Amino acid sequence: MTEKKPLNINIQSEIGGLDAVLLHTPGAEVENMTPKMAQRALYSDILNLSIAQEEYAQLSGVLHKLAKVYTVSDLLVKVLDNETERQALIGKICVMEQVTDYFDMLMDMPSARLAKVLIEGLPAKINTLTSFLNEDYYALFPLYNFYFTRDAAVTIGNNALICKMANRVRTRESLIMEAIYKGSGEFSCGIINAYDYQPGNHDIYMEGGDILIARDDILLLGNGARTSTQGIDLLTARLGALVSEGRRHIIVQQLPHKPESFIHLDMVFTLLDRDKCMVFEPLILGDNQYQTVHITMENGKVVKINSVSNILSVLRRLGMDLEPIICGGESDEWDQEREQWHSGANFFAFAPGKVISYARNTHTLDELSKHGFEIIPAWDFIEGKASVEGDKRCVITIEGSELPRGGGGARCMTMPLSRKPVKWE
């Protein structure tokens, strides 16, 4: 019997043909929330789980037809089946979340049950005065945001970056992702764990929605509420240590901390094709107070840092001449703001010129149609009524009345693991 080889992690762009992707279907963790807990959970509203799952089934169904799909739950069970990996992960979680008295209980659970608890939450034992008076219902809080698999870890080249999240409520996501990359046996990659560097420095944090790979030598980073300048400095230093030869470019876009729809760069800018991108015009192209900074690296060292007019201007100088397509359309700023709020700029490319987005952002879709993109409803593609073959540009649309309430779109909900190389010329 031939031994199964692990998948080599390889992401050199945002648009290369998708070979493998990591997903997590929203489950009971999303429903284990009250309106009072929504803010702590980083939600603007509570979700209707059954509708959210129906919408997510469209995204999952599309991706199952396009690439190999891995799921967080299945991989986590594989990790927990290994006693050494189980002990390491549960130990880290118990120490990080200050619940060491639950260690033995968690270790005794069957793997499938334990995986469920780690994601959906564990109610606290009421057996002391402290626990009786504690207002928190959970010892381990549900991972409300885990269906946004993009944020807790990032694949860059042949490496997985384990992100140090901006909010402690999401720390367990990063621990689980590290365990999956290290201990599931499914992947072959280098690992950069941001928690290993200056662990006491709370000013260091970054999330995957702020990290876009424009080209193998160009990284786009957002600097806002979820990714700090110190986090970017750490990422720059670690990547410099890994890639010690040649010239590399890091382009940093400052972001507003409010409103919450600007939490990540991919909420205002995503790549669609070799020569096209989706932008929220007021921030990316308009006159505003938010800087765009170009960091040039030579042989792993920073040699120049300078301000530039915008992302597109510096990409053009680097040989990527991108035509901007405007989120919400070109004519009405209200439409732009409304559709950006519901992840109208957040696209996931599964091949050059072939993307996935929400169906609700009609003005954005009209703008894409004007630029030659065929609009394909998800179920038409899943059921074989429409094709994405050939050179045509297309956007597959999924329903999105509940999923956007969590604060993200198609790119946020996908963690690409392997893509084909892009022929740039």
Where are these regions (language model features)?
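The feature marks the mature, well-folded catalytic cores of soluble enzymes
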Residues: T2-E425
